Amino acid sequence: MADARSLHRPLGFGVAAIVLLLDQISKWAIMGPVALRERGLIEITGFFDLRWVENYGVSMGFLIAGSDRERWLLVAGTALIAAGIVAWIWREKAKGDVVALGLVLGGAIGNIADRTRLGYVADFLDPHIGDWHPFLVFNVADAAITIGVLILVLRALLVREPKVPAENVDAV
């Protein structure tokens, strides 16, 4: 009989693939047919716009890559993190954690693809309240990473896995 890990792995990697696909399709649309790069800003509503931002750093402008060397260091660092997440998905038994890790992995790969192909990460989602912008401009990959990390934190704080009785634990 398969264990929980082998049953949940396809789910985690499937979530990652869906996030990557949605991220790259949205960026293709924004840079292609929508032509946001040329337009700069498209006002949608009083609380949401499309705004073109070339992000040369990571979250909140941290670790700005000012040179090609720094850019490739960011790519390598993100790839190492993604490899760690793959290993975590491979070992993880909890379905909720596997889904959250899939969100993070798909987002990380989406941003790696941008940084490799474009030299920056394309951000364009701009929620706001009037003139107040409580969030930085972000993309689908960033949203998936944030949601995945929040799920992991909430599950770590709130979810208690049932304990296995000692007689059911395999001897080493």
Swiss-Prot record:
It catalyses: Release of signal peptides from bacterial membrane prolipoproteins. Hydrolyzes -Xaa-Yaa-Zaa-|-(S,diacylglyceryl)Cys-, in which Xaa is hydrophobic (preferably Leu), and Yaa (Ala or Ser) and Zaa (Gly or Ala) have small, neutral side chains. The keyword Cell inner membrane applies. Pathway: Protein modification; lipoprotein biosynthesis (signal peptide cleavage). One of its GO terms (molecular function) is aspartic-type endopeptidase activity. It comes from Rhizorhabdus wittichii (strain DSM 6014 / CCUG 31198 / JCM 15750 / NBRC 105917 / EY 4224 / RW1). Belongs to the peptidase A8 family. It is found in: Cell inner membrane. One of its GO terms (cellular component) is plasma membrane. It is an enzyme of class 3 (hydrolase). HAMAP family: LspA (MF_00161). This protein specifically catalyzes the removal of signal peptides from prolipoproteins. The keyword Protein transport does not apply. It is a multi-pass membrane protein. NCBIfam families: lspA. The gene is lspA. This is Lipoprotein signal peptidase. GO terms for biological process: proteolysis. The active site is at D123, D142. The chain crosses the membrane at residues 70-90, 94-114, 134-154. The lineage of its organism: Bacteria, Pseudomonadati, Pseudomonadota, Alphaproteobacteria, Sphingomonadales. Its EC number is 3.4.23.36.
